[in-house]
A protein has these predicted regions:
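Ferredoxin-like alpha/beta domains used as RNA- or RNAP-binding modules
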Residues: 1-27, 51-75
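Short, well-ordered loop/turn sites that connect or cap secondary structure elements
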Residues: 30, 39-40, 59
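C2H2-type zinc-finger recognition helix
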Residues: 33
Length: 75
């Protein structure tokens, strides 16, 4: 089985927290809020290494979001 190398990106937020669906749009992982809702509901997103199905989940600096072989670090 081939191991997929995951790319890492650091995304800075200017507020105390950001909701998961807004974060996915901010880092250009998805194009629309509707797409963000679908990928989160489908269990395609991991937050801090756990599958997350709450699109309103609050992300804070230090959290990580994994989607489509990219790990986004919230800073």
């Amino acid at each position: 089985m081939k191991r997929v190398e995951k790319r890492r990106e650091t995304i800075q937020i200017k507020t105390e927290f950001i909701k998961l669906d807004a974060f996915l749009k901010l880092c250009d992982a998805v194009q629309t809020g509707g797409h963000a809702k679908l990928v989160v509901q489908d269990g395609a997103v991991r937050v801090n290494n756990e599958i997350c199905t709450q699109r309103g989940r609050k992300l804070r600096p230090g959290d990580s979001v994994e989607f489509e072989n990219v790990i986004y670090l919230v800073e």
